[in-house]
Swiss-Prot record:
InterPro entries: EFTU-type, P-loop_NTPase, Small_GTP-bd, T_Tr_GTP-bd_dom, TF_aIF-2_arc, TIF_IF2, TIF_IF2_dom3, TIF_IF2_dom3_sf. The gene is infB. Belongs to the TRAFAC class translation factor GTPase superfamily. Classic translation factor GTPase family. IF-2 subfamily. This is Probable translation initiation factor IF-2. It comes from Thermofilum pendens (strain DSM 2475 / Hrk 5). Residues 83-86 are annotated as: G3. One of its GO terms (cellular component) is cytoplasm. Keywords: GTP-binding, Initiation factor, Nucleotide-binding, Protein biosynthesis. The keyword Protein biosynthesis applies. CDD domains: aeIF5B_II, IF2_aeIF5B_IV, IF2_eIF5B.
Amino acid sequence: MSNDQGSQFLRAPIVVVLGHVDAGKTTLLDKIRGTAVAKREPGTMTQHIGASFLPWKALEAVCGSLVSQIRAEVVIPGFLVIDTPGHEAFSNLRRRGGSIADIAILVVDVLRGLEQQTFESIDILRERKVPFIVAVNKIDKIPGWKSFPNTPFVESVKRQSEAAQLKLEELLSYIIQQFASLGFRSDRYDRIRDFTRVLALVPVSAVTGEGIPDLLLVLAGLAQRYLKGRLLASIAPGKGVILELKEEAGLGMTATLILYDGVIRRGDIVVTGGIEGAFSTRVRALLMPKPLDEMRSPEDRFLEVERIVAAAGVKLVAEGLEKAVPGAPLFVAVSEEEVGRLKQLVEEEISGVKFERDVVGVVVKADTLGTLEALVGYLKKQGIPIRVADIGPVVKRDVVQASMVKEKDPLYAAILAFNVKILPEAQDEAARHGIPVFQERIMYKLVENYQKWLQETRDAEVRKAFEKITPPAVVQILPGYVFRRRDPIIVGVRVVCGRIRSGVPLITKDGREIGEIMQIKEHDKVLDVVSEGAEVAISIRSKAIVGRQVKEGDYLYSNLSIEEINRLLEKYEKYLAENEKSYLRKLMRFKMGLSKEIEYP
């Protein structure tokens, strides 16, 4: 390392964009980058790998007259905006106990408010302790809104009709209520005095550019005022995170590295994490994108650099990167001796995310360390136990783990595969053992699908157990339909309440035991179960005689014990009709001696 090692400087804040699908994340990113480029100011946007650096000088021109609202001189060099919006990129910007992202823009559709993935985004931002501001997007879609392209929101809103302003207030009020239900105080940014206590809502249009100056201004103001300590970096051995891995022609496997502290040079020894654990390698090349006007061909896209200083996005070329995983930390080692210590550090960090435990729980597979960590956190919040959390495709061993769980609790014998393949032998093994594999590219849908299956399986098990209990049932012997008067009695009945099946014991109104139903027939067809309203012939194994102990027109009742009645009313109530519950309560009164006969119907 050079002799300037240790000197400190203020680096650019790392900014990430999150929000629900179709809220306009990509359009907003494009607009922010495009606006900076369009100004053609000195020090305009620099394209990094996996990120864009927006210098404050270029943004100052975009913000125009609004800049005077920042009471102090802006000292941050600009923003490093991560190019890929959404959960997955953010999940990979991980570091122990938080995120390397310094601040986030949460994009919300003004017409739809907070949605499923918005709530997920808020959860993950809270979990990783990342401050955020809210871009309330698509104001150009508000009925009656007149667009003024690239104008600050505070100027554009004054030029709107009263009706459009009222509609905006109504929509913002709903979003403010939604945030309040999550424990956040929020308000339109130009009405906030203390940004540490109130969440800033910035109305914007990613299409027309309205509100973009305001958004950048709030971002700069917050970073400047509240993140200064966090943004102190030093010319020391670099620290970063692998955002993604990509095969490049002529280069092999390369890593997109987001460097958040220090410096990395060509030839440095680096330590990172892989599927098999921590490993070290030497940097062969550091690549940055060539300016468009310097590209000779699609292959001629990169410019080799000697060193990179934080904060930056860079393409790293090194041996063995095919073993690495996105979301893994990467540290520069100053000597071979330090490699061991850094490997241990990386191992400790990875083992907190990847694990295997001897517990009854699901098997979780994800494509990156970041998404695995996010998914494990999400499942824990949902109260779903985890046996295995790992990176990579679903393999036969995962099915074996799930099969072991099946022996103890089939409800958790499942594999959740996020953005990964299922190898053919694993697919065959899962089919053979009846292990469900849930595969999805959207996290909440993956968990939702498993929870739906879990509920359906639970319901089916409860229903199965319910079917085995003597059902609540009342039948009436139809006058003129006595086919045999003594054992076995054969009579025509109408099912007045519940359902009957063979094996159901019947009693009279005063509790006399008549016998069990042997068979149910309708027009010579034998039936297993019949429900309320059916008229069928039943045979009863009985010592009673029709005309003596039981007569035509009499009601017969299914005979349940007090314990069975309690179990039905407590555990299976949702499967019972109102009249079945009514019958069971009246049967309970009779069984407890509170009535002389069954008072039903």
